[in-house]
Curated annotation (Swiss-Prot):
It comes from Shewanella loihica (strain ATCC BAA-1088 / PV-4). Keywords: Flavoprotein, FMN, Oxidoreductase, Pyridoxine biosynthesis. Binds 1 FMN per subunit. It is an enzyme of class 1 (oxidoreductase). Pathway: Cofactor metabolism; pyridoxal 5'-phosphate salvage; pyridoxal 5'-phosphate from pyridoxamine 5'-phosphate: step 1/1; Cofactor metabolism; pyridoxal 5'-phosphate salvage; pyridoxal 5'-phosphate from pyridoxine 5'-phosphate: step 1/1. Its EC number is 1.4.3.5. It catalyses: pyridoxamine 5'-phosphate + O2 + H2O = pyridoxal 5'-phosphate + H2O2 + NH4(+); pyridoxine 5'-phosphate + O2 = pyridoxal 5'-phosphate + H2O2. Homodimer. This is Pyridoxine/pyridoxamine 5'-phosphate oxidase. Belongs to the pyridoxamine 5'-phosphate oxidase family. FMN binds at residues 62-67, 77-78, 83-84, 106, 141-142, 186, 196. PROSITE patterns: PYRIDOX_OXIDASE (PS01064).
Amino acid sequence: MSNLSDIRREYTLGGLHREELPDNPMVLFEKWIEQIRDSEILPDPTAMSVATVDAEGQPFQRIVLLKRFDDNGFVFFTNLASRKAEQIAHNNKVSLLFPWHALERQVAVTGVAEQLSTTEVLKYFVTRPKESQIAAWVSKQSSKISARQALESKFAEMKAKFSQGEVPLPKFWGGYRVRPSSIEFWQGGEYRLHDRFLYSRKDSSLKEGGWDIDRLAP
């Protein structure tokens, strides 16, 4: 077994101060995601880990791309027959993590996932490249397959089927909006004295009210 205990580095890019924080965490999130995108350090700056829990209480994570965010929450799209969708149907409490370590930052979100309307899903689906639209029809996400060749054969079949005209939206393809109940911003600090600030909803409905802001020990 490898010993990784000697792998470490100092965090030197700067701190996060209470007086700099906006009242609305989405304002800070927008600033941070623009900075990581503009830095061009990460090839997928919108990549986030989505954690869900199954009926037995077993958590599971996967990387998903954030497609939209606003004061109502964070939006992503997926196959509605996938493991994540099945787990959300059982328990819609989820967490998101944006690991922007290149800027010595991370953002952790907790909240509830709400399924998007067909209108919202279609509005995004039509913007996808045609090959990606076809791929949505091909993959029964999270199911077992015999070999990659089976997937490629199905893709070729569906590509021929949809060679003319628009690709329709599959009924089993959709999206979710995660309405946040808390958002934590983490900025690396020297000597492991990191800065952590937690925004928590004042209103239990998750849809109204302001935010409490607390500094957390690193």
